[in-house]
């Protein structure tokens, strides 16, 4: 007698549950719910949003109506022939080049990047091919250049605290999985890959959120290049976003999550590395579109 009423209550609830369950399964099956969750996740992780950026040299449009987003902890490769607009674009993102129009948001806020200091203050660091190292200084002195640790002698005479700078440099290198045994050597005596590591470490000391790298593996041997690649991957594991300019598609496909192709100042396309081919990217660089499409 008790079972029948309970059963009668259960059947309507069951009948309501089945359609809802089927609706969920069908939507999930066709990717609608999954796609929305991905979009929401990406939206919440947008670190930088560039909208309709324009930069001209006289009558030449070096960057022509370019828009894209950078997500937290991703490696974003920027590729294209010489003169495509890559370097001009990243100079604008680092405050080294004024923009004619367009907008930039960083960490959810509109920003004006008029000078490199503006970029530095919000957590954007740049590594150019020149590296900007002082050859006569050792590793800690280069890492702390411009932000040296000081101590007081006799309570009032400032002096560089070389012990603390060396200690913190080693800790920083270890944090990012870097083995650099000759930290007391002048950087002029270091290899190309080691010098690259020192320059990157100087940026990491500032707790950057986005690092822009111009040809980071240029002129490096296989072993040296592998060390720099590993460091970049370790940076990503710490949720640091990275924009890499490179002509080496082998490195790009090893590193990047997404690839942006530029030609004649325009953004041709942005593709996921996992779902494209080197041939497709070469076609976009050469012809401005994938010839297979």
Where are the regions a protein language model picked out?
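Long, intrinsically disordered low-complexity tandem-repeat segments
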Residues: 3-20
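Glycine-rich phosphate-binding loops of nucleotide-dependent enzymes
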Residues: 35-293
């Amino acid at each position: 007698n008790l079972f029948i009423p309970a059963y009668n209550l259960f059947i309507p609830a069951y009948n309501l549950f089945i359609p809802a369950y089927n609706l969920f399964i069908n939507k999930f099956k066709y990717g609608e719910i999954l796609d929305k969750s991905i979009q929401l996740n990406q939206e919440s992780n947008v670190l930088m949003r560039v909208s309709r950026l324009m930069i001209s040299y006289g009558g030449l449009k070096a960057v022509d109506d370019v828009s894209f987003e950078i997500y937290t902890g991703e490696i974003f490769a920027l590729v294209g022939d010489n003169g495509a607009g890559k370097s001009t674009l990243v100079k604008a993102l680092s405050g080294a080049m004024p923009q004619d129009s367009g907008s930039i948001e960083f960490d959810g806020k509109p920003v004006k990047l008029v000078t490199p200091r503006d970029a530095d203050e919000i957590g954007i660091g740049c590594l150019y091919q020149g590296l900007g190292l002082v050859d006569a200084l050792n590793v800690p002195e280069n890492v702390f250049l411009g932000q040296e640790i000081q101590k007081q002698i006799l309570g009032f005479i400032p002096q560089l605290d070389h012990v603390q700078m060396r200690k913190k440099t080693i800790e920083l290198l270890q944090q990012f999985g870097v083995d650099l045994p000759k930290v007391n050597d002048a950087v002029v005596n270091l290899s190309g890959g080691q010098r690259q590591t020192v320059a990157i470490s100087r940026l990491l000391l500032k707790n950057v959120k986005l690092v822009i790298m111009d040809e980071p593996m240029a002129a490096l041997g296989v072993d040296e290049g592998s060390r720099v690649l590993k460091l970049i991957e370790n940076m990503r594991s710490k949720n640091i976003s990275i924009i890499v300019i490179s002509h080496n598609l082998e490195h790009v496909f090893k590193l990047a999550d997404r690839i942006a192709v530029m030609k004649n100042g325009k953004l041709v396309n942005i593709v996921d590395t996992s779902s494209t081919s080197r041939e497709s990217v070469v076609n976009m660089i050469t012809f401005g579109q994938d010839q297979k499409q």
